[in-house]
């Protein structure tokens, strides 16, 4: 009897051990399945976020097209009747759609904390400042046009002031498929110049942009025309041409009556299912205003800057830009962005007659909320001769709190041209936004 009990116990032990060993692979399989399910859920969340942005953009397009359709239907049914003032009245459909003052309004703020080895009491050095506050307005004017305006305020060290950053009227549907814009806008050159400061990955514009066009890039009053160029390869090929007021931009005469002309050509290539490449070319022409040297009675010379400007088209700027995008699983993304500019000019205004510069930026968004990157700058500046160059390295880290707020941390190591002292700076920037903004913070 005891033998039977012992045999039964042995068989039961072997059976349980066998089942436990068989269960181990099943548990591992379940763990792997759970991990894959979690990855799939994260991917779905990222896709839902992208779809939400797409739907919002499409709703804006549908709203504008509905206004156009309503206007066209009314134009077919009834001709516009003259008003008491003798000016033709808008069709009733358009009046209902755009008659009221109901623009999209947004407020965007940028606050910066900066520590630097630079001992000058310049704006923002070793201080916390409200770098900029933007007030944005945009609205469809009628079925054929819209208006956009950006007014900025700053907490300047010397004088607080308001500035019209952009205010322009857009008219689409012009002959031959052109779209026109008139007013004040950011010049359509390269990549970074088109962006407002809070849209940049870094806390400041690249050195070559600041040296050639100003600390905030080039924005000026003028006229812009854009169109798509048909081609046998069926590639997206866009060209824009601008005539800008000449009193802006460090490289030009600074005189309103001598305009700046520029063109920008860009194309887009879908290299693989997960990668694409955007290429662009820029040309700019403008006047210099070299001083007139006058001989005094005592034998000395005086340099006089002439108000009418001289040296027609003495400034020629050429540039190229290349942006590579790589879309990774789970919403991750790598961006490699590069811009190069060089000038051909006399040395009568600035010390350097062949200034040039470039930057290369690599940005890695490794999660929905975080990204990091580094920007390298090289600049052979306008006002330093002898072929001396400025180099700078700027690693940064960004926390994307939401579409409407972000926080940036950046360190910049700069070796200036001309033997000046090396500078190290640290920045902490917070961007925040309320309202309906046409370009998101992120």
Where do the language-model regions lie?
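Outer-membrane beta-barrel "beta-signal"
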Residues: 225, 399, 422-442
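Outer membrane beta-barrel transmembrane domains
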Residues: 116, 350, 363-365, 369-414, ...
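Bacterial N-terminal signal peptides
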Residues: 8-17
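Bacterial N-terminal signal peptides that target proteins for export
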Residues: 1-8
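N-terminal periplasmic/intermembrane-space "pro-region" immediately following the signal or transit peptide
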Residues: 21-120, 439-442
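Outer-membrane beta-barrel translocator domains and adjoining extracellular loop/strand segments
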Residues: 116-123, 158-168, 194-198, 250-257, ...
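Detector for outer-membrane/organellar transmembrane beta-barrel domains
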Residues: 274-382
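Outer membrane beta-barrel
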Residues: 90-249, 255-274, 278, 283-285, ...
């Amino acid at each position: 009897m005891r033998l039977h009990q012992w045999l039964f116990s042995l068989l039961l032990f072997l059976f349980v051990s066998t089942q436990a060993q068989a269960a181990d692979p099943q548990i591992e399989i379940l763990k792997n399945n759970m991990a894959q399910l979690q990855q799939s859920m994260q991917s779905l969340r990222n896709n839902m976020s992208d779809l939400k942005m797409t739907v919002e953009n499409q709703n804006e397009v549908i709203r504008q097209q509905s206004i156009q359709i309503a206007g066209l239907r009314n134009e077919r049914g009834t001709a516009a009747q003259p008003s008491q003032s003798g000016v033709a009245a808008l069709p009733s459909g358009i009046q209902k759609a755009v008659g009221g003052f109901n623009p999209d309004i947004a407020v965007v703020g940028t606050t910066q904390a900066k520590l630097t080895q630079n001992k000058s009491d310049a704006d923002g050095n070793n201080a916390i400042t409200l770098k900029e506050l933007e007030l944005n307005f945009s609205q469809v004017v009628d079925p054929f046009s819209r208006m956009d305006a950006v007014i900025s305020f700053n907490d300047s060290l010397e004088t607080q002031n308001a500035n019209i950053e952009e205010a322009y009227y857009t008219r689409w549907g012009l002959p031959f498929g052109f779209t026109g814009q008139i007013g004040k806008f950011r010049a359509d050159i390269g990549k970074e110049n088109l962006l407002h400061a809070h849209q940049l990955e870094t806390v400041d514009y690249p050195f070559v942009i600041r040296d050639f066009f100003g600390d905030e890039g080039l924005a000026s009053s003028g006229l812009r025309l854009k169109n798509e160029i048909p081609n046998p390869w069926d590639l997206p090929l866009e060209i824009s041409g601008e005539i800008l007021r000449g009193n802006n931009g460090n490289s030009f005469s600074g005189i309103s009556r001598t305009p700046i002309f520029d063109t920008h050509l860009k194309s887009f290539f879908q290299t693989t299912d997960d990668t694409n490449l955007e290429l662009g070319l820029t040309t700019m022409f403008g006047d210099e205003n070299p001083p007139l040297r006058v001989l005094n009675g005592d034998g000395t010379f005086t340099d006089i800057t002439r108000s009418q400007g001289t040296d027609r088209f003495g400034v020629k700027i050429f540039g190229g830009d290349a942006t590579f995008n790589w879309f990774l699983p789970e919403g991750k993304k790598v961006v490699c962005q590069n811009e190069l500019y060089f000038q051909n000019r006399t040395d009568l205004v600035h010390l350097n007659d062949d200034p040039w510069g470039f930057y290369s930026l690599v940005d890695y968004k490794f999660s929905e909320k975080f990204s990091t990157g580094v920007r390298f700058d090289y600049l052979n500046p306008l006002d330093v001769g002898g072929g001396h160059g400025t180099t700078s390295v700027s690693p940064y880290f960004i926390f994307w709190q939401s579409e409407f707020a972000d926080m940036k941390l950046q360190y910049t190591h700069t070796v200036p041209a001309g033997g000046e002292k090396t500078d190290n700076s640290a920045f902490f920037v917070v961007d925040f936004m309320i309202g309906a903004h046409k370009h998101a913070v992120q």
